[in-house]
Every structure is written in C-alpha cells, then in structure tokens.
From Swiss-Prot:
The lineage of its organism: Eukaryota, Metazoa, Cnidaria, Anthozoa, Hexacorallia. This is PI-stichotoxin-Hcr2i. The record marks R43, G44 as: Reactive bond for trypsin. Negative results: does not show activity on all potassium channel tested (Kv1.1/KCNA1, Kv1.2/KCNA2, Kv1.3/KCNA3, Kv1.4/KCNA4, Kv1.5/KCNA5, Kv1.6/KCNA8, Shaker IR, and Kv11.1/KCNH2/ERG1). Residues 33-83 form the BPTI/Kunitz inhibitor domain. Its main location: secreted. GO terms for cellular component: extracellular space; nematocyst. Belongs to the venom Kunitz-type family. Sea anemone type 2 potassium channel toxin subfamily. One of its GO terms (molecular function) is toxin activity.
Length: 85
C-alpha cells in the first residue's frame, strides 16, 4: 500500500514539474499572449484555447494540428496561468 502511494506521488510530482517547465519555456519565448489566434494549415480538429487580447479572456478554438503560434494552449488552466486571465 505504501509502495503504491509512493509511486503515485512520484508520478504526480513528475507531471507537475514537467508542466511548470513547459509554462516557463513558453514565457521566455516572448509575449505569446498578444499573438493572434492561428488555427494552422492542417485539417485536424484539436480543441485548444488562445488568449484574446481584446477581451482579456482565454477563448476556445479548434486547432488544425500544424503551424500556428505560441498562443495555443491545451487547457483553459494553462492559458490562464500563462496569460494571467
């Protein structure tokens, strides 16, 4: 029981630190929150979020899967965390 708990705790910590590292990397790339929404040039259908600088809110959109820019977040939480919405 303790072993299972420890393994779960290690996995959760690993995912957490990996996501923090990703957030930090996006921040140092420049002000991605002011970039326009870009759906990309491919025909995929991936639900994503972008920061709309006119409304000051994270807004859902459908990403095509390639191209695009940094203002493209997999979750609403990630968009809000990076762009402080």
């Amino acid at each position: 029981m303790k072993g299972t708990f420890l393994i779960c705790l290690i996995l959760i910590a690993g995912f957490y630190f990996r996501s923090i590292q990703g957030f930090y990397f996006k921040r140092i790339q420049g002000n991605i929150c002011s970039e326009p929404k870009k759906v990309g040039r491919c025909r995929g259908s991936f639900p994503r979020f972008y920061f709309d600088s006119e409304t000051g809110k994270c807004t859902p959109f459908i990403y095509g899967g390639c191209g695009g820019n940094g203002n493209n977040f997999e979750t609403l939480h990630a968009c809000r965390a990076i762009c402080r919405a």
